Curated annotation (Swiss-Prot):
Highest classification ranks of the organism: Bacteria, Bacillati, Bacillota, Bacilli, Bacillales
Domain of life: Bacteria
Disulfide bonds: none
Species: Listeria monocytogenes serovar 1/2a (strain ATCC BAA-679 / EGD-e)
Disordered as annotated region, ranges: 102-130
GO cellular component: cytosolic small ribosomal subunit
Protein name (Swiss-Prot/TrEMBL): Small ribosomal subunit protein uS9
Amino acid sequence: MAQVQYYGTGRRKSSVARVRLVPGDGKIVINNRDWEDYIPFAALREVIKQPLVATETLGNYDVLVNVHGGGYTGQAGAIRHGVARALLQVAPEYRPALKSAGLLTRDSRMKERKKPGLKGARRAPQFSKR
């Protein structure tokens, strides 16, 4: 019989993560690499674990992730969002715990665009009085 899999798509900044949860012993694999090799910062690894900790399912599921776009922070946020959405498919009763922790909300903050006449989004060229 085919193994049960739960899917979730997460987004953050310009990153998109496709997450699969498979019943297992808690392994996390990101882009076919161990997550500790892929994400070198412990703080971002904690971010990824948040949905599993909030629902007390840490160690019950293997997390298999394909993620592209953005940097470490964006990708970690996208994975967190995807894991939270996949956990909803596992059991809808996780919704209150995930919702109260703010893990189901897509973080809509994006990089502000550069404006003409300015050096960046808001940075103006140096002003000289004389």
